[in-house]
Curated annotation (Swiss-Prot):
Belongs to the CLCR family. The active site is at E165. The 141 kDa mature form is autoproteolytically cleaved by the metalloprotease domain, producing a 109 kDa form and a 35 kDa form. The cleavage is necessary for calcium-activated chloride channel (CaCC) activation activity. N-glycosylated. The metalloprotease region is responsible for autoproteolytic processing. It can also cross-cleave other CLCA substrates. Its main location: membrane. Keywords: Autocatalytic cleavage, Calcium, Cell adhesion, Cell junction, Cell membrane, Chloride, Glycoprotein, Hydrolase, Ion transport, Membrane, Metal-binding, Metalloprotease, Protease, Secreted, Signal, Transmembrane, Transmembrane helix, Transport, Zinc. Changing N522Q: Reduction in size by around 2 kDa. One of its GO terms (cellular component) is extracellular region. The gene is CLCA2. Residues 32-901 are extracellular. InterPro entries: CLCA_chordata, CLCA_N, CLCR, VWF_A, vWFA_dom_sf. This is Calcium-activated chloride channel regulator 2.
Amino acid sequence: MTQRSIAGPICNLKFVTLLVALSSELPFLGAGVQLQDNGYNGLLIAINPQVPENQNLISNIKEMITEASFYLFNATKRRVFFRNIKILIPATWKANNNSKIKQESYEKANVIVTDWYGAHGDDPYTLQYRGCGKEGKYIHFTPNFLLNDNLTAGYGSRGRVFVHEWAHLRWGVFDEYNNDKPFYINGQNQIKVTRCSSDITGIFVCEKGPCPQENCIISKLFKEGCTFIYNSTQNATASIMFMQSLSSVVEFCNASTHNQEAPNLQNQMCSLRSAWDVITDSADFHHSFPMNGTELPPPPTFSLVQAGDKVVCLVLDVSSKMAEADRLLQLQQAAEFYLMQIVEIHTFVGIASFDSKGEIRAQLHQINSNDDRKLLVSYLPTTVSAKTDISICSGLKKGFEVVEKLNGKAYGSVMILVTSGDDKLLGNCLPTVLSSGSTIHSIALGSSAAPNLEELSRLTGGLKFFVPDISNSNSMIDAFSRISSGTGDIFQQHIQLESTGENVKPHHQLKNTVTVDNTVGNDTMFLVTWQASGPPEIILFDPDGRKYYTNNFITNLTFRTASLWIPGTAKPGHWTYTLNNTHHSLQALKVTVTSRASNSAVPPATVEAFVERDSLHFPHPVMIYANVKQGFYPILNATVTATVEPETGDPVTLRLLDDGAGADVIKNDGIYSRYFFSFAANGRYSLKVHVNHSPSISTPAHSIPGSHAMYVPGYTANGNIQMNAPRKSVGRNEEERKWGFSRVSSGGSFSVLGVPAGPHPDVFPPCKIIDLEAVKVEEELTLSWTAPGEDFDQGQATSYEIRMSKSLQNIQDDFNNAILVNTSKRNPQQAGIREIFTFSPQISTNGPEHQPNGETHESHRIYVAIRAMDRNSLQSAVSNIAQAPLFIPPNSDPVPARDYLILKGVLTAMGLIGIICLIIVVTHHTLSRKKRADKKENGTKLL
């Protein structure tokens, strides 16, 4: 065993021990929302810089969370409440003695407050991109939702809405309503409303008012325009995930109240489990118990934090390791690019370096012009030292000294740490790092970088990157491109349009086209880098055919970069570049193109790449995601490709999909996903995503994705229908996309351990089928689903196993003993292809079916599930359970449900009351006429 392999585990053990010792600090330093003693600490709510200043927003947020805390406490049976909340005030608002931020930023917020950019909707929603029981990304409220009290009529009180969304975000449960399928036929052949619980009552309403249920039915389906209006007064106490606006609703659907037959997303995504079952299975509930007594918890405490000056320090490794594999050259090129193009104006920037000791190279300098940028570039290192040992802690110490010169503390500052060496004493400065209030972004170069380097980023909420020693990799520049101010102001941040590199032979060329769409174009820059002594021949064509040559670029021969800034707004369209290698040997030529938004009212299309977990153990796959959107609207049908670079070996490319199958949970939400499991060896992997958008194919969605709080159109109260104001349109105007667009984003890095050396047996099964659907046509049942692969969502599975039952509980609890459907003639197709399979279920489902409890009842529904098998007999998990009505004779109409019987009784009673009232009125009128006649007659007699 080598000295390094012995020292590594010892160092890691010391590092872990130190982390445990400092664990009390973690809830407040980069660890996100933590549950301690039944209370949530660290919830971060951030207001976007584009939101106009309004102090009522802050007071309403406080009221919302305070109400939500008590509502959540009771709904979870005295389990959890909100204790400490931070509200991040944008720097664009006036400073009111708010605390200075530490590691908080808009991009890390659990809740964001911002408009939808051009839309008029106010739906609160949570972006969920993972499966059942998994945390979401963020909750989104519009300022209007938080300020306009009229909206509470449709959504319910803001505190109740927040609890609905919190359950999405924290516990990964889904909505129990379905606007697309508001009605269904249950197992007793009754027409039911999609809801949870089934005890919630109301009446059917046609386009012109109340109507009998049968007027809503055409061919046993509900007529378009027929809806169900809920009673404002209910006895049902569930469910928060259905209609939190009802005053009686105070809990989540549990095993006794959950409606397993309703065609909603909760049933589909969570295999018919109740919301409460999923919630109680969460880590929060495994580590907490109900509070004793009857007292309520204390109300939440709020702290307002606000960003000040943006402060960045580059902390750069200059040890002898940086001389290997052109690492210093790559660092110089990327750092120059960052200083000249990426870092935002008015930012304070300093530079420190380190080998075995630290050194300050440049004190803080505010960027107000290009001259300021050039001055900072001049301080970048040009040589490496002869020292092989490094001290990352010494470098960080100098970095803190630099940033503390401004305000005496490092609060809110950013460190960009770049290193290729191992530091076994890295844990020594961990307390200083944790207490600094600084965010550390780490960039590891090559395979010898400190194995614990990423912990600095993880604990401070920073990003993690890896740059392999591959000559044509552009990962270093991609990493610096990904690092933004974190303010959430997309109009001030750069957008990466292109990033590519190739090893080009002598007298050969690198040629490609990049699209500048009409949402970007300001501050557009083309960057070319090379390895040889002189630049390649550069030819660039704009969309009008104008040519730019090498002499039009600003060249830095020391760093081997050539940059071209397009004045004003770059012309939209296709820009074509050609790089000719005029050198006598092969060299890596690379191109990077960035731009900024061209219109402050129109957000640019963006892509954010990330992984589900950044550290895992073989054979667990990596889930790769790319969120492609414009503003908050998803962009559909784009071509999204992930490139994964290992420490050793060739890069792997993978097409990401938004098809609602395999790794992709929700179809057409703009989040493209895929499993990655092609692990070459243990170590770090770098991720980058390319997006290409064809105007003839790709389209922006017309609605915001995510799990939305239900907007109730109206209620019935005392026999009267009271309609709410129509829900505002959440659609968007279609914009001309003549050229499409291209985008690039680094997804950071991830690491994998436990990868076997050499060939290993197949350990990857087909992925779970999550989109099984069943449709009954006459006497046949047609199933459809997306084909899984031989390995997860790639390749081709070997066989399918389809089973069915008339008992939901049977197929849910005992799939292996449900009725087997003959699929011998059905061979799986390639992963991603839509499968369709039709069969007749009658021969196996005649007569009543015995239930697990020994009872029997006649069921009019069939439940079906499926799993796939690969050639090595590895099985997927059982799919979601699909359901459909059995064959119903023509004279067997659906039985009116209780809601209709209630309505019929009400209408009958109202009719009887009306008849009685009519009799009374007629009798009264007759008697009155008779009295008047008698008086007239008596008067005549007196005269």
